[in-house]
Amino acid sequence: VSTMRAAGKAWVSVVVLAAGIALLPGLLYLLGLALVGGWPQPADRAPSGVAACSSEPRTGFQPMNPWSFAAQFFDDDAMKKKVPEVEREAFWIARRHLWRQPRHDMLRWHLSSTALTIWITRNWSAAQIADTARKEDFCRAWSKRRAPGGPMKR
């Protein structure tokens, strides 16, 4: 009987640990959002109608989520891929928004900027992201940051 109890406790421990690991990205995302003071608002449409800084196609845009973001760190192929333009623009918007808030420690900065980037890709259209990034001087920074050897990597 005691062996069965020990085995049962071990299984419960394994299930609780697995559930904790599975929930961790979502919990960190929610914590990061809780640390953000206010939400950025998308810009109005660019007068020219051309919002992107590059000619990269914006078709097939997939909003980010906490689990796919965390999973990319364990996938060598994902780490080698070029970061989609929409994700770079969303990160730029999140970073600029957080710069306007009181400064905090580095861990809080990274957690809140990542969570806000994910939130922006989930709640704004690709056009809203591009227009807002352009308004936030992303195009000027983007042209300076492009490496002569090729596009930025993850």
Where are these regions (language model features)?
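Juxtamembrane regions of bacterial inner-membrane/periplasmic proteins
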Residues: 2-154
